[in-house]
C-alpha cells in the first residue's frame, strides 16, 4: 500500500539525485574543456590537480550513496514506518549530494546550477529530526501518527 508522504519523498529524492548527476556532469565537462590549473600548482591541467580529483571522487561517492538509498527506498517491501524512514534517508542523501555538487561546481568553475525550488517541500532539517527521533527514541514519524 502506498502512502502519499512516501511517494512525495521518493519524487523529491529522485529529482535531487537527477539534478546532482546533471550538475556533476556539467562540472566535469567544464573542467575538461575550459578549466585552468591554479597558477602556482605543478600541474599542466586542472584535471591533474589532486585536490580537484579528490573533490570529484567525493561527489561521486555522495551521488552513488544517494542512488543506493533511493533504490532501497523504492523497492523496500516493509511496514509504512520502515518505508517512510527509508524514503527520508533517500531525501537527505540526495539533498546532500545536490548541495555538495553545487558547492564544488561553484568552487571549481565559478558557476552555479539553478537548484530546484524548495516551494512545497519540507525543510531538510526536519528530515534529520524525524530520522534522529526514530533511531534514538523509537518514535514513529509524525506523518504516520494518528
Predicted regions and their residues:
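Glycine-rich phosphate/cofactor-binding loops in nucleotide/flavin-utilizing enzymes
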Residues: 1-15, 102-146
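Glycine-rich beta->alpha junctions and the first turn(s) of the following alpha-helix
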Residues: 1-61
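Aromatic-residue detector
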Residues: 23-24, 47-58, 69, 76-83, ...
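Extended amphipathic alpha-helical scaffold segments
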Residues: 24-38, 67-74, 101-105
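Short alpha-helical interface elements
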Residues: 31, 38, 59, 81, ...
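C-terminal helix-coil-helix/basic helical segment that borders enzyme active sites and/or dimer interfaces
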Residues: 60, 64-96, 103-115
Amino acid at each position: 500500500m502506498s502512502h502519499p508522504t512516501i511517494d512525495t519523498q521518493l519524487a523529491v529524492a529522485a529529482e535531487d539525485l537527477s539534478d546532482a548527476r546533471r550538475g556533476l556532469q556539467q562540472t566535469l565537462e567544464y573542467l575538461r574543456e575550459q578549466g585552468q590549473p591554479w597558477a602556482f600548482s605543478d600541474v599542466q591541467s586542472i584535471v591533474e590537480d589532486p585536490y580537484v580529483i579528490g573533490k570529484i571522487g567525493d561527489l561521486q561517492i555522495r551521488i552513488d550513496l544517494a542512488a543506493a538509498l533511493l533504490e532501497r527506498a523504492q523497492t523496500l517491501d516493509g511496514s509504512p514506518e520502515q518505508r517512510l524512514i527509508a524514503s527520508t534517508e533517500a531525501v537527505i542523501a540526495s539533498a546532500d549530494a545536490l548541495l555538495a555538487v553545487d558547492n564544488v561546481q561553484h568552487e571549481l568553475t565559478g558557476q552555479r546550477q539553478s537548484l530546484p525550488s524548495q516551494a512545497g517541500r519540507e525543510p531538510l532539517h526536519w528530515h534529520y529530526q524525524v530520522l534522529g527521533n526514530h533511531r534514538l527514541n523509537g518514535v514513529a514519524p509524525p506523518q504516520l501518527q494518528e
